[in-house]
Regions:
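Glycine-rich phosphate/ribose-binding loops and adjacent secondary-structure elements
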Residues: 172-307
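Hydrophobic faces of well-ordered beta-strands that scaffold small-molecule active sites
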Residues: 67-70, 95-100, 127-131, 150, ...
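Non-catalytic positions within long, well-ordered alpha-helices that form the structural scaffold/packing
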Residues: 91, 144-145, 207, 281
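Active-site beta-loop-alpha junctions enriched in small/polar residues
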Residues: 72-74, 102-104, 130-134, 155-159, ...
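Short, acidic/polar
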Residues: 79-87, 135-145, 198-201, 273-274
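Active-site cofactor/substrate anionic-group-binding motifs, chiefly glycine-
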Residues: 58-105
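An N-cap/entry alpha-helix motif that binds or orients negatively charged groups
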Residues: 1-59, 63
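A glycine-rich helix N-cap at a beta->alpha junction
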Residues: 120-139
């Protein structure tokens, strides 16, 4: 029989702990920059709702609606059930869905089922695989193949890694690694933050790596610094809670003014309701994602509540 993998067990426990903390800490009395944005009301709209076309193009694919369920979790029994319910809801609603980091399944193939369930529950959905920039290109290829993904997310989480006791400390070659992954996989690559935002400078640097789009994933939603700090015995990084740029600020910096960045920009991070979705679209996002809101709804209201 296969010997036990202590590191794999630790990663699995961390996955489940992240899930519990993400639900408990979600939206902890945090102000939202979206509330600083208001629309001008026009009393003569001049259009009927049936004439509104909400479709968009992301990574060369047409989406009926500019919305997606963003990356969260996977790789354990508990998180597999979450992924199954999220994917089922995505299939019912006809929206795209991204899985959480697949590192655990790439190291331990027995955990791959927690991710494959997404494609099984959403066979016709646009599905995004998910890896970090530290993986070898061949591992990224395996991640895409694992769930028959239509695109690959590469998540950037330097702030989280620094607070995580077992996290990475060397980020010098991330851009080069992203370029190598983008060249190796045969699907479009979307580089995303995990909740701290992408600056214009970062997006400009990513333009040179060959990726197809970015997801600014700004501050205001799930805060992985707060989550990792809760895992520390002394909770000694609480002063960093709230770090990063808001999604609204990221969009304004990237797309406002006369010279928008050269990559398509997706938006996520702190998206609470349909009005926030429209606000992000008005700021230029090609599509808008949410994760924490759906996770909390699933935990509190079950799969039926999520579908509603």
């Amino acid at each position: 029989s296969r010997p036990a993998d202590p590191a794999g067990s630790e990663r699995a426990a961390r996955k489940d702990e992240h899930l519990e903390l993400a639900v408990r800490l979600h939206g902890a009395d945090r102000p939202s920059a979206f509330d600083d944005l208001a629309f001008v009301h026009h009393a003569l709209p001049g259009i009927g709702t049936e004439a509104v076309d909400m479709s968009t193009t992301v990574c060369g694919a047409r989406w009926d609606v500019p919305f997606y369920i963003n990356a969260m979790t996977g790789g354990t029994r508990a998180t597999a059930a979450v992924n199954a319910d999220l994917a089922g809801a995505a299939a019912d609603a006809g929206v795209a869905i991204a899985c959480g980091s697949q590192h655990i399944a790439l190291r331990d193939p027995e955990r791959a089922e927690g991710f494959r369930v997404i494609r099984r529950e959403a066979p016709r959905a646009f599905v995004l695989a998910n890896v970090g920039p530290t993986l070898a290109p061949e591992q990224a290829v395996r991640a895409v193949e694992m769930i028959e993904a239509d695109a690959l997310q590469i998540h950037l989480n330097a702030a989280q890694e620094l607070v995580m006791p077992e996290g990475d400390r060397d980020f010098r070659d991330w851009a080069e690694r992203i370029a190598a992954i983008a060249a190796a996989v045969d699907v479009p690559v979307v580089v995303k933050e995990v909740g701290f935002g992408l600056s214009r400078r970062t997006i400009t640097a990513l333009e040179r790596t060959g990726v197809g789009a970015v997801d600014v994933a700004g501050a205001g939603g799930t805060d992985f610094i707060a989550i990792e700090n809760e895992r520390r015995p002394r909770r000694d990084y609480s002063y960093l809670t709230g770090w990063g740029q808001s999604t609204a600020l990221c969009l304004l910096e990237a797309l406002g003014g006369e010279e928008p960045v050269g990559l398509p920009v997706l938006a996520s991070g702190g998206v609470r309701n349909p009005l926030d979705v429209v606000r992000a679209l008005a700021l230029g996002a090609s599509a808008v994602g949410a994760s924490g809101h759906f996770l909390r709804t699933l935990v509190h209201d079950g799969a039926d509540g999520l579908r509603r």
